[in-house]
């Protein structure tokens, strides 16, 4: 029996290693790997990219574009985990749960671009509310997110884990201070916002896991929109989603904190709607593993859809 061949280009980076770990013991796919000495050899990479059924690119943006250019075999399908193609119209955005029928689009796509970690939480919260008309497209969205340091890739992991005292001395590192984070165009486009969202990311002194929050002033929404209606919209949208759940309002009301590490090691995304006592303000929240639903888990979910696994979404 012949099994689909998968080549991970960049399998020694943070995301590539995680994807390899998720696939190495599976019996329904065959992993094509290159010897260590050949991983950066353009000719050998090109051979592998054209010999596989599905290529997963875990590379910097420029290298990912180069890898796509190496592919001459029209049968090869691609999942790109970089941000190189996330706003390109000829690539399918790899967030199966974001819209009805989108898992089908991914399943039949030739080119799939994996979402960024922060956009996964932001789009997961915003898009259903915008589509339902509960949140105006021109709402002034502000997003704050804290990720484990693995979100910074191999360099950040090495800095935190190799004894770099300067890196470990800061319990929180707020960055993107020029307000030009590369995820902003992706969030705006796929959430459906009319304007750029205000986005402030940070790294915490822990390895992985994200908590992302978006404050909402109900007085700026259409008349009659309440926290309960926002929650009902999200709960309905994700009712059949295998990897996304929406906290019941009672659980959200009883919460005293949000643990960014709560879903580590999973491909799950947990959304919440927290309403203050007088009902005038709402805090939308998302908790997930930046290396799971925010990266490698999402890539494997998209791979499963492309291989015909209906249960993947």
UniProtKB/Swiss-Prot annotation:
DNA damage is among the record's keywords: no
UniProt entry keywords in alphabetical sequence: Amino-acid biosynthesis, Arginine biosynthesis, Cytoplasm, NADP, Oxidoreductase
Signal sequence annotation: none
Pfam families associated with the record: Semialdhyde_dh, Semialdhyde_dhC_1
Record-linked InterPro entries: AGPR_type-2, NAD(P)-bd_dom_sf, NAGSA_dehydrogenase, Semialdehyde_DH_NAD-bd
GO biological process, one term: L-arginine biosynthetic process
Reactions this protein catalyses: N-acetyl-L-glutamate 5-semialdehyde + phosphate + NADP(+) = N-acetyl-L-glutamyl 5-phosphate + NADPH + H(+)
Enzyme class: oxidoreductase
Intracellular or extracellular location(s): Cytoplasm
EC numbers on record: 1.2.1.38
Any Gene Ontology CC annotation: cytoplasm
Positions of the catalytic residues: 117
One GO MF term: N-acetyl-gamma-glutamyl-phosphate reductase activity
Primary site of residence: cytoplasm
Entry's family note: Belongs to the NAGSA dehydrogenase family. Type 2 subfamily.
Functional summary from the UniProt entry: Catalyzes the NADPH-dependent reduction of N-acetyl-5-glutamyl phosphate to yield N-acetyl-L-glutamate 5-semialdehyde.
Protein name: N-acetyl-gamma-glutamyl-phosphate reductase
Natural source organism: Burkholderia orbicola (strain MC0-3)
């Amino acid at each position: 029996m012949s099994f689909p061949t998968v080549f991970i280009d960049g399998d020694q980076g943070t995301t590539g290693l995680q994807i390899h770990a998720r696939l190495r013991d599976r019996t329904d796919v065959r992993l094509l790997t290159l010897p260590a000495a050949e991983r950066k050899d353009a000719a050998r990479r090109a051979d592998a990219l054209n010999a596989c059924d599905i290529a997963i690119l875990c590379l910097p943006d420029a290298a990912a574009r180069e890898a796509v250019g190496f592919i001459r075999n029209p049968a090869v399908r691609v999942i790109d985990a970089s941000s190189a193609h996330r706003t390109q119209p000829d690539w399918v955005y790899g967030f199966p749960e974001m819209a009805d029928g989108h898992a089908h689009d991914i399943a039949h796509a030739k080119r799939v671009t994996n979402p960024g970690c922060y956009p996964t939480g932001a789009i997961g919260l915003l898009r259903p509310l915008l589509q339902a008309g509960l949140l105006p497209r021109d709402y002034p969205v502000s997003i704050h997110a804290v990720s484990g340091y693995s979100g910074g890739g191999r360099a950040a992991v090495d800095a935190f884990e190799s004894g770099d005292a300067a890196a470990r001395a800061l319990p929180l590192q707020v960055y993107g201070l020029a307000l030009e984070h590369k995820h902003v165009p992706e969030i705006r486009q796929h959430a459906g916002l009319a304007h750029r969202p205000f986005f402030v990311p940070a790294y915490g002194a822990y390895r992985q896991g994200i908590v992302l929050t978006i404050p909402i002033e109900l007085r700026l929404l259409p008349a009659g929109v309440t926290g309960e209606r926002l929650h009902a919209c999200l709960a309905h949208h994700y009712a059949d989603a295998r990897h996304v759940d929406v906290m019941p309002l009672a659980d959200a009301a009883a919460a005293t904190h949000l643990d960014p590490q709560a879903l580590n090691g999973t491909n799950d995304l947990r959304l919440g709607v927290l309403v203050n006592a007088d009902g005038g303000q709402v805090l939308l929240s998302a908790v997930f593993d930046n290396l799971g639903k925010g990266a490698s888990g999402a890539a494997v979910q998209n791979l499963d859809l492309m291989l015909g696994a209906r249960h993947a979404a």
